[in-house]
Structures are given as C-alpha cells and as structure tokens.
Amino acid sequence: MLVGKNITLRLININDLDFLFSVENNIKNFQFSDNPKFYSKEELTDFINNSSNDITTYNQLRFVIEYKKNQIGFIDLFDYDSINKKAGIGIIIDEEFQNKNYGSESLDILIKYSFKELDLLSLYANIDPSNFKSISLFEKHGFLNKEKLLYILKKWD
C-alpha cells in the first residue's frame, strides 16, 4: 500500500471487481483508450485473480486509487522492462473525482515508487493528442512529449 496526503494506492483485489467492471466498460473512457472493448465480469475476474504484487511476474501492476476508503480510479505500471529499467504508466480517475488533484497526487506517489523502490530509470505514457487533461497532468510531473503520442519521464529529469 502506498499512502499519500489524501489518497492511497493499493493493489487490486477481487473486491474491486464491480468498480473495475464499471470503469472498463464505461463508453466515455473508450475515447482515449488504446484498446476500447467491453470486458465481461469473467474476464475481469481472471485478470484480478492473475494479478500479482510482483511486477516481474506479469510485467504490470494495477493499483486502485482510494480517497477516504472509496475507489476513485486506477493507476497502472505496464510493459515493465527489467533490462532497460522502464515501464509504461496509465491512470484513470472516475469523472466525479477529476479536477480535485487526486490524479496528480496518485501520479506523484507512483513516480516516486517506480524510481526509488523499483529502481526504474524511465516511465512513459501513451497519450492521445486530444486528451488535454492527461497531457497537462503528465507534463506537470515532468513528462516530455517525445513523439505524437509518447510522453517520457527519466529518473534524472
């Protein structure tokens, strides 16, 4: 569990199934998704059951973002590359909790965890050019636009 001032990041578990189902299948979220598709509860149950607290097992970690013990979003590390010490990072916050600094705090916590605890050297985010909220969030945290959809943060930046 990673604890910030207002929010907590914890690894996903089966109790998060209904929230995961609602977020993954919210058509509003498809607009900026790399993989817009509907998931069944069975598929998501398998995902949760096969998740690990060790990033090296499946090359990813999914954290639930909690505010006052309520689920408000997810933040992920994915495509973990142990050789080059890098990973992708993605975040989604429930619409009701956007623009309240929870995404920023979550990103800050996971960046610090990634560089200090996982010893990563860089993080990247694939962001749709029309997703101005995400672009602003990631740039605020030092990510630089390197290509059309790619934003990168290096440990020494």
Where are the model-predicted features located?
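Short acidic-aromatic low-complexity motifs
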Residues: 15-18, 56-58
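Conserved catalytic core of Hanks-type protein kinase domains
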Residues: 22-23
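Short, intrinsically disordered/low-complexity patches at protein termini
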Residues: 42-45, 53-56, 96, 123, ...
